[in-house]
C-alpha cells in the first residue's frame, strides 16, 4: 500500500526542484544528476509524520536497491536517514516505476558489497567517506509483497 499523508517539500532548493520535476513528469524527467540515474525516495518524517521526497543516486543490483546516507560527507547523517530508521517502510520511484519497500541498514560484509556497488555508480561516495569521521550508512530495500 503506498505511503499516504501530507507532503512537505524539502527546504533545499535543488532537492525540492528535482523531486517536483520527477513527480510532475511521472518519472520521465528529473531522473538524472550529473548524467547519472537517480531514484526518488519517499519517507515518513521522524518528527512530523509528513511525507518527504528525496532524490538519491540509483544503486541497484539484480532488481534490489540500496540507498546511501552520505550527505556529501557531512559530519551528520542526512535528515532522511532518521526518517528511515524510525519508519523503515519507504516508497521508491525508479523512473516511471514505483514500489513500496522495507529498508534495512546493512553492516559488515553485506555493507562492503553494497558500498562497492554504490561507489561504482557514484565514485564521489569514496571521497565523501574520507571527509567524515562517521561511517556512511547504507540501507538495502526489500520489496513489500501485496498485502504486506
UniProtKB/Swiss-Prot annotation:
Instruction: Name the domain of life this protein comes from.
Output: Bacteria
- GO (cellular component) term, any one: plasma membrane
Catalysed reaction per UniProt? oxidized coenzyme F420-(gamma-L-Glu)(n) + a quinol + H(+) = reduced coenzyme F420-(gamma-L-Glu)(n) + a quinone
Instruction: Supply the InterPro entries for this chain.
Output: F420H2_quin_Rdtase (IPR004378), Split_barrel_FMN-bd (IPR012349)
Annotated GO molecular function terms are:
coenzyme F420 binding; oxidoreductase activity
Q: Which PANTHER family match?
A: DEAZAFLAVIN-DEPENDENT NITROREDUCTASE, F420H(2)-DEPENDENT QUINONE REDUCTASE RV1261C
The name under which this protein is listed is F420H(2)-dependent quinone reductase Rv1558
Source organism: Mycobacterium tuberculosis (strain ATCC 25618 / H37Rv)
Origin organism lineage: Bacteria, Bacillati, Actinomycetota, Actinomycetes, Mycobacteriales
Amino acid at each position: 500500500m503506498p505511503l499516504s499523508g501530507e507532503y512537505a517539500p524539502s527546504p533545499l532548493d535543488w532537492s525540492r526542484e528535482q523531486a517536483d520535476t520527477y513527480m510532475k513528469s511521472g518519472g520521465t524527467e528529473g531522473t538524472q544528476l550529473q548524467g547519472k540515474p537517480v531514484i526518488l525516495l519517499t519517507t515518513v518524517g521522524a518528527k512530523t509524520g509528513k511525507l518527504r521526497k528525496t532524490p538519491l543516486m540509483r544503486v541497484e543490483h539484480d532488481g534490489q536497491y540500496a540507498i546511501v546516507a552520505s550527505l556529501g560527507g557531512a559530519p551528520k547523517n542526512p535528515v532522511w536517514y532518521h526518517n528511515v530508521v524510525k519508519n523503515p517502510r519507504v516508497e521508491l520511484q525508479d523512473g516511471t516505476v514505483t514500489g513500496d519497500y522495507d529498508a534495512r541498514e546493512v553492516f559488515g560484509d553485506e555493507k562492503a558489497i553494497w558500498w562497492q556497488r554504490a561507489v561504482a555508480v557514484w565514485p564521489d561516495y569514496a571521497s565523501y567517506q574520507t571527509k567524515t569521521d562517521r561511517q556512511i550508512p547504507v540501507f538495502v530495500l526489500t520489496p513489500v509483497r501485496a498485502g504486506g
